[in-house]
Amino acid sequence: MANHEQIIEAIKEMSVLELNDLVKAIEEEFGVTAAAPVAVAGAAGGADAAAEKTEFDVELTSAGSSKIKVVKAVKEATGLGLKDAKELVDGAPKVIKEALPKEEAEKLKEQLEEVGATVEIK
């Protein structure tokens, strides 16, 4: 088994694309994400905090089998260019839109699910 120095040296020699592939492989193997944890301030109301939530994030968890349709739907919903929309879909799970009112978030979720995507509202 390789020691820590050998692993670090191997990583230093990798290209950005190789490092990206390595991160994805580690995420899949261990069921983790490379996203930095977000600190959440505690709500004063406890159970009332859930009832008071007015803004929701729409997260694409999977593009499903109709990736092209999902890319088009994401492009349309976000106003991104085709390349950026494709990168966002390829990088799923990713937040598509943030801080939406509940009705808009549910509408976007419905639109994306109609084209085969798996979506969560958070």
Swiss-Prot record:
Keywords attached to this entry: Ribonucleoprotein, Ribosomal protein
Organism: Staphylococcus aureus (strain Newman)
InterPro entries: Ribosomal_bL12, Ribosomal_bL12_C, Ribosomal_bL12_C/ClpS-like, Ribosomal_bL12_oligo, Ribosomal_bL12_oligo_N_sf
UniProt subunit comment: Homodimer. Part of the ribosomal stalk of the 50S ribosomal subunit. Forms a multimeric L10(L12)X complex, where L10 forms an elongated spine to which 2 to 4 L12 dimers bind in a sequential fashion. Binds GTP-bound translation factors.
Pfam family, one: Ribosomal_L12
Record's function text: Forms part of the ribosomal stalk which helps the ribosome interact with GTP-bound translation factors. Is thus essential for accurate translation.
GO process annotations (BP): translation
Protein name: Large ribosomal subunit protein bL12
Domain of life: Bacteria
A cellular component term, taken from the record's GO annotations: cytosolic large ribosomal subunit
